[in-house]
Amino acid sequence: MKRVAAVIEYDGSNFFGYQGQPDVRTVQGVIEDALERIFKQRIYTQAAGRTDAGVHANGQLIAFNCPNDRMTTEDIKNAMNANLPDDVYVKEVFEVSKNFHPRFDVKKRIYHYFILTSKQKNVFLRKYVWWFPYELDLDAMRKAAKYLEGTHDFTSFKTGSDERDPVRTIYRIRILRLKNDLVLIRVEGRSFLRRMVRNIVAALVKVGLKQWEPEKMKEVLEARDRSAAAGTAPAHGLYFYKVLF
């Protein structure tokens, strides 16, 4: 029995998140249902990240044991895509070592967050960007983001329900102005707490609006108190972009 990994993209709009749950539609659920149709047995998968409801992915990485050694990776990819709904797509399948685990073996996770700052709403993008029709000072946001890079206790940027170790490492945060009034916030790190990226985005927007000085970010980080930070940016602007391992 060989072990394979698959790079998956999905539109999170109509999912209750990635992780399988009873009685609701999840990304893991539809993937494992597709695998069961292919292999005539339940196949359990592991993933590099558990995205929340409404969050999208360009490069989610999953792994599972394939019970049919005669199938090539291209065969597996084609079979999965033939059995998946049209809001999930397998981009690539490749063999990995027997003990590979995408959650623990990934060295870097990259998230993208898109903000649309145009005065007029774009109804076609309403599920895919955060429409925020205000001017943002990106230079101030970049200065604030520097305080978050490195290894820190990110208690101020986690949800109260996340009991994991709050110490995390952010390698880099880039903030770019794209065409058509789009702003991209790219966050690179080894691993993240639940809603950590969205909470960081909300805080950076406070700086961009000049409601906070860039130095406020250091103060919020050191407070280690969720109430010291801003709210949470909407889920639909966030994309699990890529993993490196």
From Swiss-Prot:
Instruction: Supply the alphabetized keyword list.
Output: Isomerase, tRNA processing
Q: Does the keyword ATP-binding apply?
A: no
Transmembrane intervals:
none
The record's section on NCBIfam families has: hisT_truA
Catalytic reactions on record:
uridine(38/39/40) in tRNA = pseudouridine(38/39/40) in tRNA
> Which organism is this protein's natural source?
Thermotoga sp. (strain RQ2)
Q: Identify the catalytic residues.
A: D52
Which cysteine pairs make disulfide bonds? none
Give the family per the record: Belongs to the tRNA pseudouridine synthase TruA family.
This protein's name: tRNA pseudouridine synthase A
Name the InterPro entries on file: PsdUridine_synth_cat_dom_sf, PsdUridine_synth_TruA, PsdUridine_synth_TruA_a/b_dom, PsdUridine_synth_TruA_C, TruA/RsuA/RluB/E/F_N
What does this gene product do?
A: Formation of pseudouridine at positions 38, 39 and 40 in the anticodon stem and loop of transfer RNAs.
The entry lists its GO molecular-function terms as:
RNA binding; tRNA pseudouridine(38-40) synthase activity
Q: What is its EC number?
A: 5.4.99.12
Q: How does this protein assemble? A: Homodimer.
Q: Carries keyword Isomerase? A: yes
Which GO terms of type biological process are on file?
tRNA pseudouridine synthesis
**Annotated binding of substrate, by residue:** Y111
The record's PANTHER family line, in alphabetical order, gives: PSEUDOURIDYLATE SYNTHASE, TRNA PSEUDOURIDINE SYNTHASE-LIKE 1
